[in-house]
Amino acid sequence: MASCSTSGTCGSSCCQPSCCETSCCQPSCCQTSSCGTGCGIGGGIGYGQEGSGGSVSTRIRWCHPDCHVEGTCLPPCYLVSCTPPSCCQLHHAEASCCRPSYCGQSCCRPACCCHCCEPTC
């Protein structure tokens, strides 16, 4: 089963923001119980082959509708108990990357997905 890549971006990991500078899957930094098994919920967005033991539904990135654009604030929320996701807000130059679905499904490429300013999910 795949594990997190330390060369990946913080937004592609399952870890708390403070852990993302060095490694995305330090056990003590995990936001999800399945962090050590390939990132679980939220992990693998943009990679498409994150672990063989999880279903597609466990790898959906749930975005809050009040998120900001990529590159600001903190990494995305990953909790499945969030308010259902809305299509992410985009930089104007990336508008074409948004399709009529949800962030983390078919809506956006990883570079376009929104980031939550506060972990309020």
Curated annotation (Swiss-Prot):
<comment type="similarity">
    <text>Belongs to the KRTAP type 1 family.</text>
</comment>
<comment type="function">
    <text>In the hair cortex, hair keratin intermediate filaments are embedded in an interfilamentous matrix, consisting of hair keratin-associated proteins (KRTAP), which are essential for the formation of a rigid and resistant hair shaft through their extensive disulfide bond cross-linking with abundant cysteine residues of hair keratins. The matrix proteins include the high-sulfur and high-glycine-tyrosine keratins.</text>
</comment>
<dbReference type="GO" id="GO:0005829">
    <property type="term" value="C:cytosol"/>
</dbReference>
<dbReference type="Pfam" id="PF01500">
    <property type="entry name" value="Keratin_B2"/>
</dbReference>
<comment type="subunit">
    <text>Interacts with hair keratins.</text>
</comment>
<protein>
    <recommendedName>
        <fullName>Keratin-associated protein 1-4</fullName>
    </recommendedName>
</protein>
<dbReference type="InterPro" id="IPR002494">
    <property type="entry name" value="KAP"/>
</dbReference>
<keyword id="KW-0416">Keratin</keyword>
<keyword id="KW-0677">Repeat</keyword>
<dbReference type="GO" id="GO:0045095">
    <property type="term" value="C:keratin filament"/>
</dbReference>
